């Protein structure tokens, strides 16, 4: 990401799935595709398409670990964009934390092998 404009960020975050991905990563730090699919109740191809857009925008970074790809928010997000994401998280905090609790109950987060195998 060389330069993220406000209109680009708002277009990206206007999609409910992309916003959910960003807020979950803001809450948990890092998740694999299968965790995101489970958390957001979306198919792997749909989540992967959204992750690609987020990665191309520079909002996300990924790392491979074996056959899994883990995603996290980029530390290079402009400060103004990070503030917007943080405020969005504050507005959706209860919803995001409920999703996180559900993910933990399904034993996905932290042990992706249960879902990702």
Curated annotation (Swiss-Prot):
Record keywords, A-Z: Arsenical resistance, DNA-binding, Repressor, Transcription, Transcription regulation
Q: Which residues bind DNA?
A: 33-52
| Domain HTH arsR-type residue range list | 1-92
Among Pfam families, the record links this protein to: HTH_5
Q: Which InterPro entries match?
A: ArsR-like_HTH, ArsR_HTH, HTH_ArsR_DNA-bd_dom, HTH_MetalResp_TranReg, WH-like_DNA-bd_sf, WH_DNA-bd_sf
List cystine links. none
One GO term under biological process is: regulation of DNA-templated transcription
SMART domains the UniProt entry points to: HTH_ARSR (SM00418)
The answer to whether keyword Nucleus applies is no
Asked if the record carries the keyword NADP, the reply is: no
Q: Which purpose does this protein serve, as stated in its record?
A: Transcriptional repressor for the arsEFG operon. ArsE is a trans-acting regulatory protein which controls its own expression. The repressive effect of ArsE is alleviated by oxyions of +III oxidation state of arsenic, antimony, and bismuth, as well as arsenate (As(V)).
Q: How does it assemble?
A: Binds DNA as a homodimer.
Name of the protein described by the UniProt record: Arsenical resistance operon repressor
According to its UniProt entry, this protein's organism is Escherichia coli (strain K12)
* Source lineage: Bacteria, Pseudomonadati, Pseudomonadota, Gammaproteobacteria, Enterobacterales
